[in-house]
């Protein structure tokens, strides 16, 4: 019965009853809408640091007093002050008696920074609204308990789905200690990623390629196979206007350690390069790669064990991997049940050719029941190309879907 309004001039939230009837009624309905409104603002500002906080989550915080936003903050980088601390410093004495909206439960442990829950409790904040509890076992409800024990009113679960989506990378990594894996492919309308001669630059247009570089900017690692390195000598860097992009860690699947010492990924110094080799790789080649500055991870005897590699990367706090490999690499990841999300770019071109490469090569799945299904599909037009993003519906590896149940 009472509509919630927000006055952008005064930065104040009021009910429609107050505006139109000359009196104020704060019903539970109005409070719920108010909580959602300010939580959306916290979620929005959390994305200011997208791609910069790994392996930490993105977190936004908003402090509200008398229906007005008096302070806000967001976590900028791992090892630096958390969102709540930035907001509290901005609020100063205005924090006393105010409400804090935060996208993730305040931390309760001493790490590279102190516990936020304790700082919030000592600030005089009267009420804390969190979008979701932190699945990190170091926290796991402890932050909210600190606040409750200090007499702070707490509420959890406001826009929880949006908060989980915001931190899908962190939630996968903190629960499984394996990175969130995103597979990207660009193809023609007839499903070709290159011509029969191997030409692939450029199938998609400038807008789609710009989108790919924005994706590189937000994920921690980028992965290709040795075939891509030998054929294209890519830099695997992020190229955005003004040079604002962050370069991901380069990861090369190279079972025999064949990466040339002259390859850009070893000589340009743009980012760390990890070579995933096998026990059968010549030790002299491995030592030369190490001497050239590469990190060499040995996983598997004849072929790179992708599941083992993901665990190794997770242990190195690489919380997300952007796979830009060819058809064989893509199929290997899909068959292993390691892919969480897919970005596909479809160009209005017809290439044809029985020998032209496709996005998913290998032996393929023999039965339709084994096919990888997608869900939560979104599409957009980028220039003349179609961009499709989706999540893998059925995780094919036991335990791989733990993060889907946060």
Language-model region placement:
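Enzymes that bind and transform nitrogen-containing heteroaromatic metabolites
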Residues: 32-40, 44-56, 112, 180-181, ...
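Flexible, acidic/Gly-rich N-terminal and inter-domain linker regions that tether
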Residues: 25-80
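A broad detector of short, well-ordered amphipathic alpha-helices
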Residues: 40, 44-47, 71, 82-85, ...
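Acidic, Ala/Val/Gly-enriched low-complexity intrinsically disordered segments
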Residues: 14-19, 29-30, 400-402
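Proteins enriched for Cys/Gly/acidic motifs involved in redox and nucleic-acid/cofactor modification
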Residues: 52-55, 144, 158-186
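Zn2+-dependent cytidine deaminase-like catalytic core
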Residues: 63-162, 249, 269, 274, ...
